[in-house]
Structure formats: structure tokens, C-alpha cells
Amino acid sequence: MKIILASKSGVRKKILDKYKIDNEVIISNVDEDEIKESLLAEGANPFLISKNLAEIKSNKVSSKNPDRLVLGADSVISLNEELISKPKSREEAFKILKKLNNSKHYLISSVCISKNGSMIWNHTDSSELKMKNLTDKELSFYLDKIETNILLSYGVYQIE
């Protein structure tokens, strides 16, 4: 059975392909920033935000593809319960890295499987991360190295 991946993440697609899971990608096109703002206003913590985003994406695509299994996923970075968003510029990326530099933070990832527009399974887990202490020069070198991928990752760095 071919599952639907409700994600534009190339990494998630590669993982499914690596394990020979027959899949097709249908992007949910939900406004993640709007959803995050709403959840934060309601007092949601980063775990709940990650879970809800995965579920919303999965359910949206699932409702348009009845009787198909849809996999939605989301990951966020949390530093002292503060959600770290994707940067919009290199300057913002540098500021985020400075904030994470030499500090403990968490990668929170959620996965949701939906069918007929409703969640049938979900899981959320976290990994504790600590970036070693880097100089401004080392941070700039890193940003130069990852180039346009700067804007694709929460927390700016890529651990996949």
C-alpha cells in the first residue's frame, strides 16, 4: 500500500525511500506560522505545538484522500521553552546560532498517521542537544558552508 507523505521535507522522503516504503508526496500547504502563533497564544508548549502541526498537516491531506494512510510530521527546536523558528535571513540565522551556542536545547519531533481526515496514531519524542562553544568566525564559516540551506532548518543547523 502506497502511503502519502504530507511534507515537503526532502529528508523525510529519503527516509521512507531508504526503507523501501512506497510513498508519494502531497504537500499540506498549511500556514505553520499562523498555527504556531495561535497555539502559543493559547499557552501551548513546544511538544504540543509539534504534535498539533504534524496532526493538522496529516489530517488536511487525509481528508482530501479518503481511505489512504497519510503520514504527517513536524520538528521544532526549543531553548528554555522558547520556540526557535526558521530564520528568514543570514543575519537572523547568525543570531539564532549565537543563542544556541554552548547551550542545551531540544529537538522535538512528532509523527502522525491519519486516515479519512482523522488521526489514528501519533508519537512525539525529543532529543537533548548541546552545541559546543563556537567563535563568531566558526559560526560564519558554518553559515557559508550550508549556504541556502540556512533558511530550511529550525535552529539553523542540520543534524540529519
Predicted regions mapped to residue ranges:
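N-terminal polybasic phosphate/anion-binding patch
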Residues: 1-69, 82-83, 137, 141, ...
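Structural motif
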Residues: 2-3, 68-69, 105-106, 110, ...
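Acidic/polar active-site rim loop that often engages polyanionic ligands
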Residues: 35-39, 78, 118-125
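Generic enzyme active-site microenvironment
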Residues: 72
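Active-site-adjacent loop/tail segments of enzyme domains
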Residues: 75-105, 131-133
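Short beta-strand scaffold segments in enzyme catalytic cores
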Residues: 75-77, 107-114, 157
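Anionic-ligand binding region
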Residues: 96-98, 110-127
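Active-site oxyanion/phosphate-handling segment shared across diverse enzymes
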Residues: 124-160
